[in-house]
Every structure is written in C-alpha cells, then in structure tokens.
Design a protein with these regions (language model features):
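Conserved N-terminal beta1-alpha1 strand-loop-helix module at the mouth
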Residues: 1-84, 89-116
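Active-site/ligand-binding-proximal alpha/beta "capping" segment
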Residues: 111-129
Length: 129
C-alpha cells in the first residue's frame, strides 16, 4: 500500500531547465500553467525529450487527453478537477494518472476517478502580515 514513498513531485509553470537539472531521478516533473489558456504542444514535446534524456518522468496537469496524445509518462488531476472524462480514454499500461486531495471528500472523488496515486495536499492559512 505504501510503496515508493520516496517519489518527489516538482511542479513547474514554465520550461526552465536550470531547476530541472537540480532534481534527482526519483522526481516527477509536473507541468501546470494555469495563467495561459493556450497550450504549446511543441514546447511540451521538447521538454518531454529533455526530461527523458535526464531520466525524469514528465506529467501534464489537468489535461489527460493531451498527455496521452503526446505520449507523456502520465497526467496529474488537481483537487479542483472533479470530472470523469478521462475514464473514456485508452492509454498505455505504463501511463499513470495521479491526483491530489485536501480532505476525505476529495479523496473519495479521486478514488472514483480511478487515479493510480493520490497525494495529500495540505491547506495553508493565508499570512495576514
């Protein structure tokens, strides 16, 4: 049940290779860019190649269909994504879907979404200073 707990997840919003080079092989790179509506598929493919050369897995956030199309290592479904459309898509057996949750209700939703791994994200209070 608790296998591979030494996996780290590193979230990026732009393709900056300097921070990626500092990650070890057990790190999974997750690209999430919520500030831009347009997805640059060519840049994602270049970064996929860059991560593969360094032995890192590369996941795309919140777009399972595109991650399958681009043959990435997996996809990340954030806690606010509650849809089940990805269950209709065919993917390789090595393709992994992970999700995050903040509470028990979101954990149950991720279980219904049939994600391979769920990691718990804590909720932080806003700093009032």
């Amino acid at each position: 049940m608790h296998h591979n707990l030494n996996t780290k997840y590193y979230f990026i919003s732009n393709f900056d290779t300097i921070n990626i080079d500092q990650q070890d092989k057990s790190t999974i790179i997750i690209y999430r860019n919520y500030s831009s509506q347009k997805i640059n598929q060519l840049a994602i493919l270049k970064f996929k190649s860059y991560c593969r050369k360094r032995g890192l897995k590369f996941y795309l956030s919140n777009n399972v269909k595109l991650a399958i199309k681009l043959r990435l290592d997996g996809a990340y479904i954030p806690s606010f994504n509650k849809n089940f459309n990805h269950l209709n898509y065919k993917h390789d057996k090595n393709f992994e879907i992970i999700g995050s949750a903040h509470n028990l209700k979101e954990i149950r939703i991720k279980e219904l979404q049939k994600v391979n791994k769920i990691f718990l994200s804590s909720l932080f209070k806003k700093n009032k200073n």
